[in-house]
Amino acid sequence: MVFRRFVEVGRVAYVSFGPHAGKLVAIVDVIDQNRALVDGPCTQVRRQAMPFKCMQLTDFILKFPHSARQKYVRKAWEKADINAKWAATRWAKKIEAREKKAKMTDFDRYKVMKARKMRNRLIKIEVKKLQKAALLKASPKKALAAKGAAAVAAAAAAKVPAKKITTEGKKAPAQKAPAQKAAGQKAAPPPKTQKGQKAPSQKAPAPKASGKKA
């Protein structure tokens, strides 16, 4: 980037240290390579010689003649609205934030910490929502799987023991008890025995007594 902040008549500078630190001045004349004649009619800085070491040049330039009187400098300053333009720059905002931070108490720093934590929590929640929406939009298969997992989680949270839900989100088929054989159906044949093994002997039922005991 080309350097454009040159020492010239009308250049507005920021005083970084010294008795007038934090104020803006305009260069009225250059005395030598180390000092300049400055004036700050709108910042309560009287016309005086000031070294370049304590000045930082800004991007603002006023149009007034060489070694102009204070009323011409004031008129050019107010016409260019230097104070409002300076307050809107990032440079001025950083200086103001630094001063506010230096004046903060322990309780103020605690409130700032809590506010930052709350802000970060809200940002994380919104980011997760956006990521989930993008995932569902990109792959419909993963969307169906996510819905099935959500259904399983909801069923587990509800704690319904009667209804068993599989991982696919469907009910498990109920097992029916074997029905009893009808009276007219024949019994199944006994299993075949291998050679060398005896067939299990079936005992005949005992005959019922015709007469009752005394």
From Swiss-Prot:
<feature type="cross-link" description="Glycyl lysine isopeptide (Lys-Gly) (interchain with G-Cter in SUMO2)">
    <location>
        <position position="124"/>
    </location>
</feature>
<keyword id="KW-1017">Isopeptide bond</keyword>
<keyword id="KW-0687">Ribonucleoprotein</keyword>
<dbReference type="Pfam" id="PF01929">
    <property type="entry name" value="Ribosomal_L14e"/>
</dbReference>
<protein>
    <recommendedName>
        <fullName>Large ribosomal subunit protein eL14</fullName>
    </recommendedName>
</protein>
<comment type="function">
    <text>Component of the large ribosomal subunit. The ribosome is a large ribonucleoprotein complex responsible for the synthesis of proteins in the cell.</text>
</comment>
<keyword id="KW-0689">Ribosomal protein</keyword>
<dbReference type="InterPro" id="IPR014722">
    <property type="entry name" value="Rib_uL2_dom2"/>
</dbReference>
<dbReference type="GO" id="GO:0031090">
    <property type="term" value="C:organelle membrane"/>
</dbReference>
<keyword id="KW-0677">Repeat</keyword>
<feature type="modified residue" description="N6-acetyllysine">
    <location>
        <position position="79"/>
    </location>
</feature>
<feature type="modified residue" description="N6-succinyllysine; alternate">
    <location>
        <position position="85"/>
    </location>
</feature>
<feature type="region of interest" description="4 X 5 AA tandem repeats of Q-K-A-[APS]-X">
    <location>
        <begin position="170"/>
        <end position="189"/>
    </location>
</feature>
<dbReference type="InterPro" id="IPR008991">
    <property type="entry name" value="Translation_prot_SH3-like_sf"/>
</dbReference>
<comment type="subunit">
    <text>Component of the large ribosomal subunit.</text>
</comment>
<dbReference type="GO" id="GO:0003723">
    <property type="term" value="F:RNA binding"/>
</dbReference>
<feature type="repeat" description="2-1">
    <location>
        <begin position="192"/>
        <end position="194"/>
    </location>
</feature>
<feature type="modified residue" description="Phosphoserine">
    <location>
        <position position="139"/>
    </location>
</feature>
<keyword id="KW-0007">Acetylation</keyword>
<feature type="modified residue" description="N6-succinyllysine">
    <location>
        <position position="203"/>
    </location>
</feature>
<feature type="repeat" description="1-2">
    <location>
        <begin position="175"/>
        <end position="179"/>
    </location>
</feature>
<dbReference type="GO" id="GO:0043231">
    <property type="term" value="C:intracellular membrane-bounded organelle"/>
</dbReference>
<dbReference type="GO" id="GO:0042273">
    <property type="term" value="P:ribosomal large subunit biogenesis"/>
</dbReference>
<feature type="repeat" description="1-1; approximate">
    <location>
        <begin position="170"/>
        <end position="174"/>
    </location>
</feature>
<feature type="repeat" description="1-4">
    <location>
        <begin position="185"/>
        <end position="189"/>
    </location>
</feature>
<keyword id="KW-0597">Phosphoprotein</keyword>
<feature type="modified residue" description="N6-acetyllysine; alternate">
    <location>
        <position position="85"/>
    </location>
</feature>
<comment type="similarity">
    <text>Belongs to the eukaryotic ribosomal protein eL14 family.</text>
</comment>
<dbReference type="GO" id="GO:0003735">
    <property type="term" value="F:structural constituent of ribosome"/>
</dbReference>
<keyword id="KW-0963">Cytoplasm</keyword>
<dbReference type="InterPro" id="IPR002784">
    <property type="entry name" value="Ribosomal_eL14_dom"/>
</dbReference>
<feature type="repeat" description="2-2">
    <location>
        <begin position="195"/>
        <end position="197"/>
    </location>
</feature>
<dbReference type="GO" id="GO:0006412">
    <property type="term" value="P:translation"/>
</dbReference>
<dbReference type="GO" id="GO:0022625">
    <property type="term" value="C:cytosolic large ribosomal subunit"/>
</dbReference>
<keyword id="KW-0832">Ubl conjugation</keyword>
<feature type="region of interest" description="2 X 3 AA tandem repeats of K-G-Q">
    <location>
        <begin position="192"/>
        <end position="197"/>
    </location>
</feature>
<feature type="repeat" description="1-3">
    <location>
        <begin position="180"/>
        <end position="184"/>
    </location>
</feature>
<feature type="compositionally biased region" description="Low complexity">
    <location>
        <begin position="172"/>
        <end position="214"/>
    </location>
</feature>
<feature type="region of interest" description="Disordered">
    <location>
        <begin position="161"/>
        <end position="214"/>
    </location>
</feature>
<dbReference type="InterPro" id="IPR039660">
    <property type="entry name" value="Ribosomal_eL14"/>
</dbReference>
